[in-house]
Regions:
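NTP/phosphate- and nucleic-acid-binding module
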Residues: 1-277
């Protein structure tokens, strides 16, 4: 049961990072046990060659209940589709189990690995619970690893637009949720005061904002935050929109919204991330 809970937790964690992870049946190796999965993120720079059924991408862990039967069914749903690294690849199996139109051969980065090895270690150590009648129930063990530094690389691989030189960190791990970027020069002084008011308003609404109050060139500021990867921006330039503010989701076109509408957008996005069911 615990193994399956971790299986679901890993899928949800990677989804919060806006990454599509493929769980693949893996060899337990010297660690032992009879159940193991590694989680692979597709990436051209990946070190692992993978062979999978494209239909696995249509699966969704949303709505999965934390119940023994439901979790086991979820895991088996994923295991139903062929997905292996080159260490376990068998050409005959691949061609037999996967229709030609659904075969995918590509590269990926391993970002997580989970093992269930039962009582392999607890039994020799006699680590368990004494039961009535002189019996003993040995502790069931597992190992659960996540490659944090690998995840950083995987996110950059997935979210950086090299052509436009724009990075957009997922909201769940972004250094800030929104950047306030005002045009400030000797001819434009009102923007600074306005940007400070917006900053304080957002902070009071528990929005993690950063204000660039330097006199750096306006377009350079925007380019800087595009590279840093803050997912949302408020731009205060020469144009006035009355009560509306120029709001940008990094890498997309801007739109004119009220401050209340911006709060709503950010709140809804955060709720999507943290309330996966």
């Amino acid at each position: 049961f615990s193994y399956n809970k971790f299986f679901l937790s890993y899928l949800r964690t990677f989804k919060r990072l806006e990454l599509t992870a493929i769980p693949m049946a893996a060899d337990t190796g010297p660690i032992g046990g009879n159940l193991s999965h590694e989680f692979i993120i597709l990436a051209d720079t990946g070190e692992s060659k993978i062979f999978t059924d494209k239909r696995i991408f249509d699966l969704n862990s949303d709505g999965s209940k934390i119940e023994k039967k439901s979790l086991e069914e979820l895991r088996k749903k994923y295991e139903k589709f062929y997905a292996v690294t080159d260490e376990k690849f068998n050409k005959n199996d691949f061609e037999k189990k996967v229709p030609e139109d659904y075969r995918l051969t590509t590269k990926g980065i391993e970002v997580g690995h989970i093992f269930y090895f039962g009582d392999k270690y607890s039994k020799p150590l006699k680590a368990g619970v004494d039961l009535p009648g002189g019996k003993k129930d040995f502790v069931k063990m597992g190992s659960y690893g996540v490659g944090v530094s690998r995840l950083v690389g995987a996110i950059i691989e997935a979210k950086y637009n090299e052509k436009d030189e724009v990075m957009k960190w997922p909201l769940s791990v972004a250094p800030y949720e929104i950047a306030i970027i005002p045009l400030i020069n000797k001819n434009e002084t009102s923007n600074l005061e306005k940007s400070k008011n917006i900053y304080n308003f957002l902070k009071n609404k528990n929005i993690d904002a950063i204000l660039d109050d330097t006199d750096e060139n306006f377009s350079s500021k925007i380019k800087k935050f595009n590279l840093i990867g803050v997912p949302y921006q408020i731009l205060l330039g020469k144009k006035s929109y009355g009560d509306l503010i120029e709001f940008v989701e990094t890498g997309k076109d801007s739109q004119s919204l009220s401050l209340e509408q911006i709060i709503k957008v950010l709140t809804e996005q955060k709720e999507k991330i943290w309330y996966l069911h």
